[in-house]
Amino acid sequence: MCASFSPTLDSRSRQLLRTLISCYIQNGEPVGSKTLAQQAGLDISPATIRNILADLEELGLLNSPHTSAGRVPTAHGYRMFVDSLVQMQPPSEDDIRRLRVEMAGGGTQALLGNASEILSAMTHFVGVVSAPRREQFVFRHIDFVPLDARQIMAILIFADNEVQNRVIEPRRVYEPGELERVSNYLNAHFIGRTLADIRTTVLCELRKAKDEMEQLLAHSLDLASQMLVPNDSEDIVVTGQTRLMALQDLSDMDRLRELFEIFASKREILQLLERTINAPGVRIFIGEETGMVSMEDISLVTAPYAAHGQVLGVLGVIGPKRMAYDRVIPLVQVVAQVLGTALEPPTMP
């Protein structure tokens, strides 16, 4: 959960803070009172501006670098900016149409890769997308292939045309004809349902006494219960890591090396994304809000993506704290919506 930081400010202070942070994001240089007098659109003297800036610094919203008379935003300043001051610049209708074209068609993995690439290319930062758990996807077809006397391969085909193979060791030996009858039964009764939903039904039915079931049903449910053991392993798609090397804001090579190690392991990034999966809308972590020392100079903007009303995963952008939040926030939101629509399986016949 990202903490809000919103001290009470009058309208002049809010306007000066908004203008200063916007100028700093654009130019990367400390902003002085003369620049603010020209850019803020307020009819006040430079002396009054300096007094207001001193008050904002006292509140912990700004900081004065030793080598400059200007000021830069702190993490608290950025937090207040994104919470209440930023003026969003959403993608144009043409951009949104292009996004839909680029995200049309293809299997799940291809769509996740496209989304990550788009986020990285349009922001020049790092794009990340967490992959959905397969248990959330819609079942279309299954085949069983005997590997040997003790092992069977279950070939699962989902509504998005992705294929997953699972090797199981059944509790009894099945003849090829039996496997065909079992697969026919499962295909007839469970098409169009998620694996999680199928598992719930199967486990419920298995609680009934076996002598109350037809033999085919018992065998089908027995195989299905073994095939549908939950697989909690998830992955994320990360694109554009090397873009961070060109950023002046991230010039600490030791910190950058630690960040690349996090990208390589993916575990910490995945845990961070999971913190936002049940939160509606865009979530923003600024610096130490990530809970990781190596990301104290980093911001993460995330949004969940969903299909047919069910949240499947989270995507986002990782970049420096000095990022164009006015463009990145609505872009992340739009890409999440477009990805969710692209992942919606077609209506089953």
Curated annotation (Swiss-Prot):
Function: Negative regulator of class I heat shock genes (grpE-dnaK-dnaJ and groELS operons). Prevents heat-shock induction of these operons.
Protein family (similarity comment): Belongs to the HrcA family.
Underlying gene: hrcA
A Gene Ontology BP annotation from the UniProt entry: negative regulation of DNA-templated transcription
A family per Pfam: HrcA
SUPFAM superfamilies reported for this sequence: GAF domain-like, Winged helix' DNA-binding domain
Organism: Xylella fastidiosa (strain M12)
Highest taxon above the source species: Bacteria
Keyword Repressor annotated: yes
Record bears the keyword Repressor: yes
Any one GO molecular function term: DNA binding
Protein name according to UniProt: Heat-inducible transcription repressor HrcA
Keywords assigned: Repressor, Stress response, Transcription, Transcription regulation
InterPro entries: GAF-like_dom_sf, HrcA, HrcA_C, WH-like_DNA-bd_sf, WH_DNA-bd_sf, WHTH_HrcA_DNA-bd, WHTH_transcript_rep_HrcA_IDD
